[in-house]
């Protein structure tokens, strides 16, 4: 038997993991083993909301060292993270300023300013990226306006996965899929857009030309002295998750479900017409030149905050209690920007219901029911928008990522959307990360080849829509007339 051992470092907004993948060439089987899992979260520092990148780096190194201590020879390493955030470095590679998180309020008002000064359509035609108030475009503008004293010291700006790869290898890289989330990459040239960079106040010299997934950035020297290639995978975690989505045919849509919910489809061409602009559709970069035509949905962030505020540790028990409640008594729009980072999520949800003359969710189960029903209804809205955009309905929806373990939400999604839902794999970002590594090692031909491996090895569960469910009746009778507010558009 011929084996490959690849390590995926997968960092999310709430947690991170170092995973070891073992690929057997002859039987084309792939197994994952968790080596190290650790928490991630927002911190308050000098008036900013920040990430603790030093702690994350220590956790990454701890996980890698654990693999080496087992005597396993690693063939390659890949790192994926969330998008838009960055770390600034000086000429010596030392950090400049703080690693500010996208949920910080420093960008307030800057998106509207950009649209007024540059033109909303022009920005969209250049980047193809949706308007979100925390995009890197506005973060850099906030930096240059609010902290001009830092500018003379900045030599490089690295997005999060590129920063951690740099810390392992000493080599800098700007990976394409994550770079597109910045709203600074020109959709026609796949390079940084000079007009958008100029408005942001950033110097183009801070960035290198984006590279597509599959190149070796450099090498990490393990404690035993071996040089291990660090591969530029599809380093935006959603891009990796889509690679591992076992999409079958052109009528399959995906939903990457986690802190954020990203719903979309793959396309060989971007959608940047007026319909796409009005719907705030994004065209993020994917592997092999494909576009991830998708829409951001606030996702399980709302639930994560409720769990934290209410100190709930038993999620299965909460879901069980939630399932016993009637559907659609409390409906909010999860994409309202009031939910980006409120002081207390529970109070914000209750206020939204009060302002719309609905019953007020009081118990933990009622709050969760409100979130699940509202997400499922928004999923139905977005799926309909995407189908209209491309002029063809979808036949099935693949839900991947940690959120696909929520069987109640999966069934609500199937019922609200009226479509077959296939849930899994859970560790989609990790698997997609591994997939690019295996292609770089010449073990697999392309993304479609890798998806065949995923389809035969992953644990997938099908949810069939129930047209007689409460939420299906709600969609048919009431929800179809509802207008949903765009997320920060």
Curated annotation (Swiss-Prot):
InterPro entries: ATPase_NBD (IPR043129), FGGY_C (IPR018485), FGGY_N (IPR018484), Rhamnulokinase (IPR013449). Pathway: Carbohydrate degradation; L-rhamnose degradation; glycerone phosphate from L-rhamnose: step 2/3. Substrate binds at residues 83, 236-238, 296. The active site is at 237 (proton acceptor). It can also use manganese, cobalt, iron, calcium and copper ions. GO terms for molecular function: ATP binding; glycerol kinase activity; rhamnulokinase activity. Changing residue 70 to A: Same kinase activity as the wild-type. Keywords: ATP-binding, Disulfide bond, Kinase, Magnesium, Nucleotide-binding, Rhamnose metabolism, Transferase. ATP binds at residues 13-17, 259, 304, 402. Its cofactor is Mg(2+). Disruption phenotype: Cells lacking this gene are unable to utilize rhamnose as a source of carbon. The keyword Transferase applies. It catalyses: L-rhamnulose + ATP = L-rhamnulose 1-phosphate + ADP + H(+). It is an enzyme of class 2 (transferase). Induction: Induced by L-rhamnose via the RhaR-RhaS regulatory cascade. Binding of the cAMP receptor protein (CRP) is required for full expression. Also induced by L-lyxose. Transmembrane segments: none annotated. Its EC number is 2.7.1.5. Belongs to the rhamnulokinase family. NCBIfam families: PRK10640.1 (NF007925), rhamnulo_kin (TIGR02627). Monomer. This is L-Rhamnulokinase. It comes from Escherichia coli (strain K12). The lineage of its organism: Bacteria, Pseudomonadati, Pseudomonadota, Gammaproteobacteria, Enterobacterales.
